[in-house]
Design a protein with these regions (language model features):
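N-terminal, post-signal-peptide soluble/periplasmic segments
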Residues: 1-67, 171
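Short, solvent-exposed micro-motifs at the edges of structured domains
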Residues: 137, 143, 320, 334, ...
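Gram-negative outer-membrane beta-barrel proteins
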Residues: 116-122, 169-177, 245, 256-264, ...
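Extracellular loop and loop/strand-boundary signature of outer-membrane beta-barrel proteins
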Residues: 80-84, 132-137, 146, 150, ...
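Solvent-exposed loop/turn elements at secondary-structure boundaries
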Residues: 176, 182, 194-199, 204-214, ...
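Membrane-embedded beta-strands that build the outer-membrane beta-barrel scaffold
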Residues: 1, 94-102, 106-114, 147-155, ...
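Flexible, surface-exposed loop regions and adjacent strand-edge segments
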Residues: 124-134, 178-199, 230, 255, ...
């Protein structure tokens, strides 16, 4: 498949950049578009070479804008539209089945399945058709092999023994091509052959009103040259024995996993510039999230084993009553790393001495199988609680004898354990350049960031000498990565850590059900029932180092006030009580429980709960008289604290996760589905041409009607929780609650679902941020400033209370319809024609409306709040599913 749309890229370049790429012309662009004076002699030779680089077609690699109309470019969001090769997707599949009868009592079957589906995109290294330049084609090589062998033996007339073994290999590796290497332009990356990912931002100084002047090229994401290869081996054995009224089943299973992560991002640097003039003059944007080269071991080889066994007895207590009972044992072995490249944080080991400002124990532990750094008393997985459990299961089915077998009552109860620890839960939160599923492979101490400095240049962004290996000879040297208070006050970035809480227990769920089925007719049955589920010890990302509230009565690490921002008075003076500005903001880094670790450090913690209750009604009509019918209706409610498996906590204060207990993100109150097939009767019964035309027709369809999904309102601009994270909250999705006095109903624009702009479904004025007043929750009281005035800090805010998934998106409906025609040509050959009408009435199903607002458009240490907030709140921007789509097919059956 070829997709020309994904082969396009909208690019932002300075509006007055021309084909004259002389230093004088480029300096003029800096002056005209940015108001910055650049001497032509100041232009860096690397930047000049990139701007003068031409493609094989004679066009410039960094293109000349196709319009100089500021208004048009602002409307489009770009001033150059590039057309590259089409994006391609290829899928190849093959399968083989083999059955062999060893004897009358022994049967062996084998299956093999192969699948490979590579994709290419000329601009996907920067996330699709947005901002990339040609030459850096992104390829995702994905595929799998699956093998299974099943052996079934009839040991005796009442004993059956079955054994299974299987193997699955999966791969998904992304790579980015490059038209040139760093050496060609004189960029010193210590021998790396990979061109760096380059980002040229627009910091707001552009004279143009074009919203985003960002230009990116090269492998600018952590997914540009990384992937995984997974091998899974499985085996099981089951024995069934029928003895009188008892049907006894026993068995066991075993599973072994090899997850190998290959990450080449320790060879790919990231370079970022504030704007085009900074790019010209080689002024790199500093900070780990901007200009960085990761140094160390970035491959991982994870291993895990699972095992289980069960025994179950299905007892025929009476002719109309069956009861099944039995326990199951599950052991979900935790992940380990083949070479011990696995670290964790143990809060009980950490120790900080406040009087001397010394971290005497950094709290990091390393897997025992690490020969150089293994921590005594720590296992290969670093987890401490048991990762196994015993799960009882009970079921019953009863048919009242007086009803002639027309009605059956069924019920069941069971516990089910599940793995809580996954590879993605080792990664830290966003914001420091090594987030995402592969972030753990770039996380200290086995990999450390090499940062650009004020003396860095485009030619030598990280100095002239290769960096030394990471300080992993012993944990004492690793402590150099974790700053004390003095270092934090001077601006040193704290260590961002992500991990799976070593104290976690194994998650499990308790399921129960009760239903009644009535066979009204031979081909018609009705079912009504109730089912429920309660999840325990579910995992959710919790920041273990969220700052505490410091007050004069309750100091924290010597701090007596709490502030995330550093607002100024009219003359630019700051409060004498707010003179610290740490990396995260204000004095946040000094109020944390563990000095030296980032407030955004996260543990995946197995403390969450969930509940699900549902009334289910169904009708099933087997095919008779040409009609087949299946219908179901579910009235349910799912509640939890955390619905997704992403890197962010969705709720209010993450240290009080129960405050975010609400409807699940995927909750659907009402769901109705109807599937049908009607075969038209035979009109003629002879073998004439007319008979072949008239007979064999059928109609089928699927109808789905369901409630919309829940949603709430977010603000990521630092307007919620600034007292903890300033504007640098990289771990939570901060919820904005209602203005006091407003209700869920009053916040909704009745009769306006949000699909007809400019009228939104929600009233922006109904929402407010939880601002704090001077003297409240540790905020300094009004007082003197550095310029002698009296000033008040009124810009601090806390987390909201409630508000998660308070609203619900539009109701959704979809009707699909098909016409079928089957014509027999001979006894063995037939033609089957289908005409499928997906969404036949072309009814739009609207997605949830936009729920992201901005109360702080400044997004900096001196916020500028606006009420009501900015953003397209309550306006629907997407639909779910496709418009009406018609397809026809013709099959030959033989």
């Amino acid at each position: 498949m070829r997709d020309a749309l994904l082969g396009t890229s909208g690019v932002n370049v300075p509006l007055h950049l021309t084909n004259d790429r002389s230093p004088q012309a480029l300096a003029s662009v800096a002056q005209t578009d940015f108001g910055v004076t650049v001497n032509p002699n100041q232009i860096d030779p690397v930047a000049l070479a990139l701007l003068q680089r031409k493609l094989s077609n004679g066009q410039y690699f960094i293109p000349t804008p196709q319009t100089s109309d500021d208004a048009l470019a602002s409307t489009l969001g770009y001033d150059v539209l590039q057309q590259g090769p089409p994006s391609t997707f290829t899928a190849n599949q093959a399968n083989v089945n083999l059955d062999y009868k060893v004897s009358s009592k022994d049967h062996v079957s084998g299956k093999y399945y192969y699948q490979v589906a590579p994709t290419t995109n000329p601009f996907a290294s920067v996330g699709g058709n947005s901002g990339g330049l040609p030459g850096f084609t992104h390829t995702l090589d994905a595929g799998s092999h699956t093998v299974s062998i099943d052996n079934s033996v009839n040991v005796s007339p009442n004993i059956v023994w079955e054994q299974r073994i299987g193997y699955i290999r999966e791969k998904a590796f992304a790579s980015t091509a490059q038209p040139f290497g760093p050496q060609e332009f004189g960029i010193n990356l210590f021998g790396s052959p990979h061109f760096p990912g380059i980002t040229i931002d627009n910091d707001g100084s552009s004279v143009s009103s074009l919203y985003s002047g960002s230009l990116q090229f090269g492998p600018v994401t952590n997914f540009a040259n990384a992937g995984m290869f997974q091998d899974r081996y499985a085996g099981s054995s089951d024995l069934n024995w029928v003895r009188g009224r008892n049907n006894i089943a026993v068995g066991f299973n075993w599973d072994y996993l090899q997850l190998n992560i290959h990450n080449l991002n320790n060879q790919v640097a990231g370079l970022e510039f504030f704007d085009f003039p900074s790019f010209l003059t080689s002024s790199l944007r500093l900070g780990q999230e901007h200009s960085v080269l990761f140094n160390g071991i970035t491959n991982r080889h994870y291993r895990a084993s699972e095992a289980g066994m069960y025994a179950q007895d299905k007892i025929a207590v009476a002719r109309n009553l069956n009861v099944s009972v039995g326990p199951r044992f599950d052991w979900d072995g935790p992940l380990s790393e083949k070479d011990g490249l696995l670290t964790n944080f143990d809060p009980s080991r950490y120790h900080y001495d406040l009087p001397t400002d010394t971290i005497t124990n950094i709290g990091l532990v390393v897997a025992a199988n690490n020969k150089a750094l293994g921590t005594r008393g720590v296992g290969d997985s670093t987890l401490t609680p048991r990762q196994w459990g015993i799960a009882p299961r009970v079921g019953a089915a009863w048919t009242p004898a007086s009803l002639n077998g027309k009605i059956v009552f069924r019920s069941g109860f069971g516990m089910f354990y599940d793995r809580g620890q996954f590879f993605t839960e080792f990664s830290p939160s966003a914001g420091f350049g090594f987030n995402g599923p592969f972030g753990v492979t770039l996380e200290p101490p086995f990999t450390v960031p090499v940062l650009a400095t004020a003396t860095s240049t485009f030619s030598n962004p990280f100095g002239t000498s290769p960096p030394p290996p990471p300080p992993t000879a012993n944990l004492e040297t690793v402590s150099s990565l974790i700053p004390n208070q003095a270092g934090l006050i001077s601006g040193t970035t704290p260590l961002l850590f992500g991990g799976y809480d070593p104290r976690n227990k194994l998650p499990y769920s308790i399921n129960w059900s009760f239903d009644m089925q009535w066979q009204a007719m031979e081909d018609l049955a009705f079912t009504i029932g109730y089912t429920g589920n309660h999840g325990v010890h579910l995992t959710e990302p919790i920041p273990f180092n969220q700052p505490n509230i410091a007050t004069p009565q309750h100091p924290v690490n010597g701090q007596i006030y709490s502030y995330g921002y550093q607002p100024t008075d009219a003359a630019g003076g700051t409060l004498l009580s707010e003179q610290i500005q740490t990396s995260t903001g204000g004095n946040t880094d000094l109020r944390v429980p563990y000095i030296g670790f980032s407030p955004n450090s996260v543990f995946w913690t197995a403390n969450a709960i969930s509940n699900y209750n549902a009334l289910q009604v169904g009708v099933n009509k087997r095919l008779k008289h040409g009609l087949l019918l299946n219908g179901s209706y579910t009235w349910s409610h799912s509640l939890d604290e955390q619905s997704g498996l992403g890197l962010f906590y969705n709720g209010n204060n993450p240290l009080n996760p129960r405050s975010s207990y609400a409807s699940s993100d995927f909750d659907r109150t009402h769901v109705f589905t109807l599937q049908y097939l009607y075969e038209l009767p035979q009109f003629t019964v002879d073998n004439s041409l007319l008979s072949k035309l008239e007979n064999g027709w059928g109609l089928s369809g699927l109808m789905v009607f369901e409630s919309g999904q829940p949603y709430n309102v977010y603000d990521f601009s630092g307007s919620v929780g600034s007292i903890y994270y300033s504007a640098n909250d990289f771990i939570t999705n901060p919820i904005v609650n209602l203005v006091p006095g407003q209700t869920q109903a009053s916040a909704i624009q009745q009769g306006h679902p949000g699909a007809t702009p400019p009228v939104p479904s929600l009233k922006p004025s109904a929402f407010a941020i939880p601002q704090l007043q001077p003297g409240q929750d540790g905020v300094p009281p009004c007082g003197p400033t550095t310029d002698g005035t009296t000033f008040c800090d009124t810009v601090e805010n806390k987390f909201s209370a409630g508000g998660r998934n308070l609203f619900r998106g539009p109701f959704q409906a979809r009707i699909d319809f098909s016409i079928l025609k089957e014509t027999k040509l001979t006894e063995r050959i037939a033609l089957k024609y289908t005409a499928d009408f997906f969404n036949i009435f072309n009814h739009p199903s609207f997605d949830t409306p936009n729920n992201n607002v901005t109360f702080n458009p400044c997004f900096n240490p001196v916020p500028c709040y606006t009420f009501p907030p900015q953003g397209q709140l309550g306006l629907i921007q997407h639909t779910i599913g496709s418009p009406r789509f018609i397809q026809m097919s013709l099959h030959v059956l033989f």
